[in-house]
Curated annotation (Swiss-Prot):
Induction behaviour: Expressed in growing cells (at protein level). A member of the dormancy regulon. Induced in response to reduced oxygen tension (hypoxia), low levels of nitric oxide (NO) and carbon monoxide (CO). It is hoped that this regulon will give insight into the latent, or dormant phase of infection.
GO MF term list: ATP binding; host cell surface binding
UniProt keyword Secreted present: yes
Pfam families cross-referenced by the UniProt entry: AAA_33 (PF13671)
Taxonomic classification: Bacteria, Bacillati, Actinomycetota, Actinomycetes, Mycobacteriales
Native source organism of the sequence: Mycobacterium tuberculosis (strain ATCC 25618 / H37Rv)
Record's protein name: Uncharacterized protein Rv2004c
Compartment annotation: Secreted, Cell wall
Length: 498
């Protein structure tokens, strides 16, 4: 074998506690570990994402792998060498790398139960710095557009469908596709904003715990995606979400959450929680597809891994679902308490009609005296103006990936119909809560209020209770009991809305 194409001046640590010669295999490559070096050769295979049938194609792929990985791990990638053929055939290219001990591998450390929070902090720092200097341009930005994001999902799901009801469930694939389409269809504002903020980068795109090593306290991030440039052009939170997903797959969702939170702090990324979940799910689907390929290559154990990855994808898409909740009821029924309690659990944005009314009055959009039903501040025209403004604000938040809880009486069926149209327009799941309490309880709560923006009186509450219209689509929440009970009931209903 000839020498690497660079000078190879980086000395490797001796590997004395593992076999001198070992072999590892992926679905597209074979890695021979020999002494203090690792030699990676491409398999002569064709998949939906690569074509390595000829030596020339494999040569180009090896060179590209070396160049791209030198961005993040220059001390680990030593160059390109060639295996010569004694019969005179074409020399086989191999990527020459520094060999690391298995105990230095992040995946090994995690599965051994070792403390890795410090390592994850270092990885988050390295990745954030890498993304800060990563290439950005108009061509890269196009891969963050709604159409490109949807296309990637559908291409992966189409590949998974080849294995439906053989390796993975066809029903699960269809459910995933539905949730993906709903998220993407209503989030044009979110994806456009990510492009405008410079979040689309030429990244790593294959950040797995198995390919990260801790060397002298510093992380080496190996094996980025090299076979198709466009797939490496991605949202930076998507790049980080890959490792978060993989840590969850290793049984440590807590570490995945820890890493992603640390990355967000170090990079200054402001992606909503829904987008983080969306991309964790995407990476789980990508890995499920890879496991299906491995299964088709004679690795029966890969089937269980594919199923587990789709479970992760489904769970995160459920969390990513953008929801619009109406929390209604008469004054004093505890609807604001319920709205705040649910929002604390799910991270939703609360819009209170009381707050909107106060702001509109302060800026002169609506006028009138408070305290009288159907007139003054509570005239029909003013009530409609308040609810329309609340819905306008909700539309902006929903389109940006934020779930919204609208806190108001919601006694008017026409206003509830407007809210349902908004949910349909933004492809958001809608859930409606109707808070209830006795007239005496409502009156006591109104009297006991300290400050706030509500102008409702006990008399208004009693009058509204007397004219309460049917609300068949509202889940009745009895708020007379402990707060924890009513909030817990609403939380479970919220989660079931897809």
């Amino acid at each position: 074998m000839d020498s690497p194409t660079n000078d190879g001046t980086c000395d490797a640590h001796p590997v004395t506690d593992e076999p001198f010669i070992d072999v590892r295999e992926t679905h597209t490559a074979v890695v021979v570990l020999a002494g203090d070096r690792a030699f990676k050769a491409k398999k002569p295979v064709v998949t939906d994402f690569c074509d390595f049938r000829t030596a020339e194609q494999r040569e180009r792929a090896c060179i590209r792998e070396f160049e791209l990985n030198s961005r993040l791990a220059a001390q680990s990638y030593l160059g390109i060498a060639h295996l010569s053929d004694p019969s005179g055939g074409h020399a086989e290219p191999v990527v020459v790398m520094r060999r690391y001990r298995d105990k230095q591998r992040l995946a090994s450390m995690v599965t051994a139960g070792l403390p890795v929070e410090g390592a994850l902090d270092a990885i988050a720092e390295v990745l954030a710095r890498f993304h800060q200097r990563a290439q950005r341009n108009r061509c890269i930005d196009t891969q963050g557009e709604v159409g490109a994001v949807a296309r990637r999902w559908h291409e992966n799901l189409a590949e998974l469908r080849h294995h439906a009801d053989k390796v993975v469930s066809g029903d699960v694939i269809r459910r995933i596709e539905h949730m993906v389409d709903e998220f993407v269809s209503g989030r044009e504002v979110l994806f456009a904003g990510r492009i405008k903020e410079g979040c689309i980068v030429d990244g790593h795109a294959d950040l797995l715990a198995d390919d990260i090593f801790l060397v002298d306290g510093e992380p080496a991030l190996l094996d980025c995606l090299e076979f198709e440039d466009e797939l490496r052009y991605l949202d930076r939170i998507d790049d980080a979400a890959f490792l978060a997903m993989d840590l969850e797959f290793l049984g440590r969702k807590d570490l995945g959450d820890y890493f992603l939170a640390g990355y967000a702090v170090r990079s200054g990324d402001t992606a909503p929680a829904s987008l983080r979940d969306f991309y964790i799910a995407y990476r789980a689907v990508v890995r499920a597809k890879v496991e299906c390929v491995r299964f088709s290559q004679g690795k029966p154990e890969a089937a269980a891994d594919a199923v587990r990855h789709l479970i992760i994808a489904t769970q995160h898409l459920q969390h990513a679902t953008v929801r619009l909740a109406l929390v209604g009821g008469n004054p004093g029924t505890g609807k604001s308490t319920l709205a705040r309690g649910v929002a604390e659990l799910v991270g939703a944005q609360v819009i209170s009609t009381d707050d909107v009314r106060r702001r509109l009055r302060d800026c002169g959009v609506i006028t009138g005296e408070p305290g009288v039903l159907d007139s003054g501040l509570y005239s029909r025209a003013n009530v409609v103006a308040v609810y329309q403004e609340a819905l306008r604000k909700a539309r902006l938040l929903l389109g940006s990936g934020h779930s919204v809880i609208l806190d108001g009486t919601w006694g008017d069926p026409q206003m509830r119909a407007c809210a349902r149209r908004l949910a349909a327009d933004t492809h958001s799941a809608i859930v409606e809560f109707r808070c209830s309490a006795t007239v005496d309880v409502m009156a006591d709560r109104i009297v006991a209020r300290a400050g706030g923006n509500s102008d409702a009186t006990a008399e208004i509450a009693a009058a509204l209770a007397a004219r309460q219209a049917d609300w068949d689509t509202g889940h009745r929440i009895d708020t007379a009991g402990p707060r924890e009970r009513s909030v817990g009931q609403a939380y479970h209903i919220w989660r079931s809305a897809i």
